[in-house]
Amino acid sequence: MPAKGRIIRVTGPLVIADGMKGAKMYEVVRVGELGLIGEIIRLEGDKAVIQVYEETAGLKPGEPVEGTGSSLSVELGPGLLTSIYDGIQRPLEVLREKSGHFIARGISAPALPRDKKWHFTPKVKVGDKVVGGDIIGEVPETSIIVHKIMVPPGIEGEIVEIADEGEYTIEEVIAKVKTPSGEIKELKMYQRWPVRVKRPYKEKLPPEVPLVTGQRVIDTFFPQAKGGTAAIPGPFGSGKCVDGDTLILTKEFGLIKIKDLYEKLDGKGRKTVEGNEEWTELEEPITVYGYKNGKIVEIKATHVYKGASSGMIEIKTRTGRKIKVTPIHKLFTGRVTKDGLVLEEVMAMHIKPGDRIAVVKKIDGGEYVKLDTSSVTKIKVPEVLNEELAEFLGYVIGDGTLKPRTVAIYNNDESLLKRANFLAMKLFGVSGKIVQERTVKALLIHSKYLVDFLKKLGIPGNKKARTWKVPKELLLSPPSVVKAFINAYIACDGYYNKEKGEIEIVTASEEGAYGLTYLLAKLGIYATIRRKTINGREYYRVVISGKANLEKLGVKREARGYTSIDVVPVDVESIYEALGRPYSELKKEGIEIHNYLSGENMSYETFRKFAKVVGLEEIAENHLQHILFDEVVEVNYISEPQEVYDITTETHNFVGGNMPTLLHNTVTQHQLAKWSDAQVVVYIGCGERGNEMTDVLEEFPKLKDPNTGKPLMERTVLIANTSNMPVAAREASIYTGITIAEYFRDMGYDVALMADSTSRWAEALREISGRLEEMPGEEGYPAYLASRLAEFYERAGRVVTLGSDYRVGSVSVIGAVSPPGGDFSEPVVQNTLRVVKVFWALDADLARRRHFPAINWLTSYSLYVDAVQDWWHKNVDPEWRRMRDKAMELLQKEAELQEIVRIVGPDALPERERAILLVARMLREDYLQQDAFDEVDTYCPPQKQVTMMRVLMTFYERTMDAISRGVPLEEIAKLPVREEIGRMKFEPDIEKIRALIDKTNEQFDELLKKYGA
């Protein structure tokens, strides 16, 4: 009979209950009136300590606790693949349908669908003898993976009944087994297994078959074995964040620095602090702007985040944008293809000069803003910010000054002053006087109440020229109001250069200049900003050019409207081929297609004509009305630690930056998941921030399985347990994931399990241990941290599975560690390194130099090199180990020589050592460096890897021979084959790469003849 008790104490995720006589360790219980899911982790008499997997806020002493009689288990059967679960295997999509985006407490749902029918094909017949692990049937779970229905461990006997081939739910009995004792066991298509107990197998095999990933630095230098264990550090510093001075457009606060936004919202909701990171899930989401369905529109931000980064990337563009983000923050590039506008997310560290990034051209929306007039009693004021008030503000901000009791506007254009005076009378019922003050005319309006009203709108009383910024109310207004302000402001501080066909506005206020670009975006106008220094003071030139832009402000320009700024990256060739229309038809529309086929950029106005002909009007009139592609002119790495910030939005992007830009709200793990020759992938997002996990949930479904062309999700199970979910569920998620991986291993599949990150899991152990008041170990982690980590990684392995037939399966575990500040000496990393056999050390310096994968060849290691050597020698090349070791020796020697070069310079080295530097550089650039975004180089099969290595080793051996015979190194460096070796990674034909060996030998033979050697 299940135990029934009462809560006597609640402390965070831990609940203590008494009256639990008969309960067992690790038994699942239902806690409180809501029936929250928990697990007993300590028993003392009839008292039970329970870790609760849901938020415990509101639980009170006296509420009931009821045992279930079963331990924390997972359901294993058809329906696992493509699923997304939380840490205790609740299907998130089903929970969302039941309770919305925020999961209600006490809610549960079966992990596997009960009503879905699966096509079952029997593999045994009545009378067959079976044991645990035997396959009794198959189900095509996805188009990639066949699910093997197995006899659960511990059951054996004779098949007395088996279902015919057909459609069945997992709840239907598909077989009956008569055990030796005469008991009849009914088998369904699914089974349950406790997550803290490893699934049994017959025999553990040595890890001697490599898990081929197609990544040269891994497969050749630091191989992972099937059934092996590896660790990789998470991204250095923080995630996808921006600099604290980044402006962000909000409805509540106007244009505000993101660090100031964080301070305003800090703690206004559920706050979480972990190490140097902190974030708040907002009680009341704020409104920002983002890219959605081809337009820039209002969206909600639900979280604000603050962290730290060890370095930043600063990107400058042609229009004057300056973007400072973390290296892995994503920006948007794109181009128009025959399928429409294709936007691609590119990490900042991959951006280079000449690239074009998507920025904001037009921000939709806006409504008349109601003004707070409650404190204004002595003058009349408009109830809303209308066109006339906006125009008046333009005159005041452009040429005005607020004195204690007077509004003064200075301009020698008397008609402008009269217009401002007319508006003052109409809007406020006060009139001024136009006077001559030395060299300039002035409109003086004596009204302290008007001064107070204008200050309330944010217009500074002193030093206005350097400190003014665009009022929040203007940024939220409709285009007609914005246009009235802009035209008035230009009349004061602007200048139309007829010869250049552009309007130039000069201001001393940095925030004012950037605010103007946001206002112009409300009109669909883009501008450029340039800085200039006059008499030691910095000024900002806001330049509006282009016929279309000027016409939106009522300025007629006769000159050609092509500015070379608003150009559209177009895949003209593919569109032209798909179109199948003659050249003459396009020429008739004024489109010289040959110019664009040869690489000339197409202006937006030309693209509009082109789009009409090729059926892409929606792209031209919707998407490209709202974004343009700004050219990157400079990229710098800033090597200094600093605070960084982020927000979470529904669109995973937001409008921000000094000028309106689209900003995003990791490649190594994606490459491993996509290309490794594991058949099933289990990804555990353990304690990652919500927006980082969202990236995974978005990116994995987009990845294609390279072998079948089908979505990678068809062979993937995702477990999403973010850092704002209860800490106890984070602890359980690791066990849930490894149990699911073992189940697919038992079918005979090779499984890759990726845990991101085990550091967050260890932090969950630390928090629970602290609440249990256990004796702490190093840095507050529990004393049993090492044994728990070992227990997890030891469940990896390549095994002979249970069952009558010989079946081999494997679970390879790759755990990400996220040490604060990249500190590899902290306890989680050190204890992990004692257990795992492979460590891929990510190097921030390599990432800065755009060397990817950024795995450091001097600090990484693999203890599987000896074990997988025979496989490489038998299946690929008997020289693999010799070449690999020689290459490693050269790279290590290069590091030693570089220390000498730093002191005495390269010229002091002997020829042979300079030759080593040359070949080591070729190894780094032509072999280790690999382009994840290149169609060919993204995956390098084993045969290609050894062929490339043989080419490089041939070049090395011939170089050393030539040097010993007196050939100058300068002559060797000039050999034409070097350039071809540099391109071989992009060559798909292995025979063409192999031909470089003969070419290398021929060119060295000629060189030796030339020098008579």
UniProtKB/Swiss-Prot annotation:
InterPro entries: ATP-synt_VA_C, ATP-synth_a_Xtn, ATP_synth_asu-like_sf, ATPase_a/bsu_AS, ATPase_F1/V1/A1_a/bsu_N, ATPase_F1/V1/A1_a/bsu_N_sf, ATPase_F1/V1/A1_a/bsu_nucl-bd, ATPase_F1/V1_b/a_C. It is a peripheral membrane protein. Signal peptide: none annotated. This protein undergoes a protein self splicing that involves a post-translational excision of the VDE intervening region (intein) followed by peptide ligation. It is found in: Cell membrane. GO terms for molecular function: ATP binding; endonuclease activity; proton-transporting ATP synthase activity, rotational mechanism; proton-transporting ATPase activity, rotational mechanism. GO terms for biological process: intein-mediated protein splicing; intron homing; proton motive force-driven plasma membrane ATP synthesis. It catalyses: ATP + H2O + 4 H(+)(in) = ADP + phosphate + 5 H(+)(out). Residues 392-525 form the DOD-type homing endonuclease domain. Its EC number is 7.1.2.2, 3.1.-.-. SMART domains: HintC, HintN. Its main location: membrane. GO terms for cellular component: plasma membrane. It holds the Pfam family LAGLIDADG_3. Keywords: ATP synthesis, ATP-binding, Autocatalytic cleavage, Cell membrane, Endonuclease, Hydrogen ion transport, Hydrolase, Intron homing, Ion transport, Membrane, Nuclease, Nucleotide-binding, Protein splicing, Translocase, Transport. SUPFAM superfamilies: C-terminal domain of alpha and beta subunits of F1 ATP synthase, Hedgehog/intein (Hint) domain, Homing endonucleases, N-terminal domain of alpha and beta subunits of F1 ATP synthase, P-loop containing nucleoside triphosphate hydrolases. Has multiple subunits with at least A(3), B(3), C, D, E, F, H, I and proteolipid K(x). The intein interrupts the ATP-binding site. Belongs to the ATPase alpha/beta chains family. PANTHER family: H(+)-TRANSPORTING TWO-SECTOR ATPASE, V-TYPE PROTON ATPASE CATALYTIC SUBUNIT A. This is A-type ATP synthase subunit A. It comes from Pyrococcus furiosus (strain ATCC 43587 / DSM 3638 / JCM 8422 / Vc1).
